From Swiss-Prot:
Keyword Cell membrane belongs to the record: yes
Name under which the protein is recorded: G-protein coupled receptor 161
Cystine residue pairs: C96-C174
Organism annotation: Danio rerio
Leader sequence residues: none
GO cellular component terms given for this protein: ciliary membrane; cilium; recycling endosome
Family the UniProt entry places it in: Belongs to the G-protein coupled receptor 1 family.
Transmembrane residue ranges: 28-48, 61-81, 99-119, 140-160, 187-207, 264-284, 301-321
Glycosylated residues (UniProt): N2, N6, N12, N97
Region (Disordered) location: 231-250, 505-526
Role this protein plays: Key negative regulator of Shh signaling during neural tube development. Recruited to primary cilia and acts as a regulator of the PKA-dependent basal repression machinery in Shh signaling by increasing cAMP levels, leading to promote the PKA-dependent processing of gli3 into gli3r and repress the Shh signaling. In presence of shh, it is removed from primary cilia, preventing its activity and allowing activation of the Shh signaling. Required in left/right patterning by modulating Ca(2+) levels in the cells surrounding the Kupffer vesicle.
Amino acid sequence: MNGSKNGTAVANSTNGLDDNGLMVLESVSIIIIAILACLGNLVIVVTLYKKPYLLTPSNKFVFSLTSSNLLLSVLMLPFVVASSVRRDWMFGVVWCNFTALLHLLVSSSSMLTLGAIAIDRYYAVLYPMIYPMKITGNRAVLAIVYIWLHSLVGCLPPLFGWSSFEFDRFKWTCTVSWHKEISYTAFWVTWCCLLPLVAMLVCYGVIFRVARIKARKVYCGSVVVSQEESSSQNNGRKNSNTSTSSSGSRKSLIYSGSQCKAFITILVVLGTFLTTWGPYVVVISTEALLGKNSVSPQVETLVSWLSFTSAVCHPLIYGLWNKTVRKELLGMCFDDRYYRESFVIRHRTSRLFSISNRITDLGMSPHLTAMLVGGGQLLGRGSSTGDTGFSYTQDSATDVMLLESYTSEASHSAHCTANKRRSSVTFEDQVDHIPQGDPSVVQVTADIHKSLDSFASSLAKAIENDAKLQLLGEWTQIPTSLFTVRNTQRVPRYLDGQRLRMESIDEGIVKDDDDDEEEMEREEKM
């Protein structure tokens, strides 16, 4: 008898040690989640707030998402940490109801916002011509307000008797008593979970299908040279044929890489949603159907832990994955080393980026946008990427979704500079690649910066001309006031000489340098 009692005591002590170790592990994990969620969402909110040009309609949804997650990490997760240590609620009934309502509200709004982001990108890809008119900044704000009201409708019933809030020691927090009202559980799952899930599956599925189609024509952000042009340039030359064959192989590899990266990005978005919220929905549905004790405590703890990790994943996927947001964040954090490397160009063109992004959001074609910002000089047919997460391609009727750049920056510069192909880059990327030692470029950039105010008066006419070009094939002269940037200040003499020399060549007249200088002097006197 004494031996059996001693064995039982040893087993109980061992179980106690295991339970204590598990409690410590759970507490440490939730502390790490709380810190990462707070920091991650805070940096995205601050970056978007301090850089207003980043608040495009698409990024307004990201701002709402990260703001709600930041609110959750500050007002709720610290109490979850305390409850995970004590295995009890110590903050009263009122605060229990408040944290339960806050958790349910933020969770519902986050899932619905993810569905809204999917719909926004769906319209950006499939309907690029009407996207800027349909998805405006004001409508994005209205959609966000509706999302919060929609979530509030789904979260208030427990306060009025349809189910209730209670502390669940295995979920570490106060939450809905899912097992008490099957009808409310079914209502909340349908109202706040299934709707965004269906929207994401449909929208991202169509986006990936369009990306596969566009990957056959667009690679590395460049317009693919047509087969006729390639054959005309290779008139029976053996070396040229060999080069063309190798180039075609590289294109095929790039196409496969583009599709793979698009698939990986969509897989990450959907996979994160299903991994963080899927198990939680399954567990609460099981509790509602089979009772409270139908799910083991370890599973309850695990699904709660996964649901909290969504607050860490959202700023990473929808914030830091964005190249522009990431660059601005690095510029804010490492001001001395990162931001001052090209301080003059970045400082003088910060407003240029803001204006150019707004012009791109108006839905104008890339060549017109480039002409507006470049002072009337066409940058060539190609593509232009806006902050809405998609790229305009003039050779295509639809746009390719850029959830993330299909190729890395290194491969972009390597492939897009070969054979003088016209690359598809943003205006910020164009400025980043300008040689820092060229004073003329800085001067021209400053001229553009000073003359941007004159664009507003003629912008409507420019949009009208662009619409005629796109829809009717007509081209009318763009107002000259748009191009006054070239005449505001005198550009360097050698640039004027190059311009005059090119004009004379086009007219069939060859002039020497002395004639060019004399003509330039006459223009200055006039």
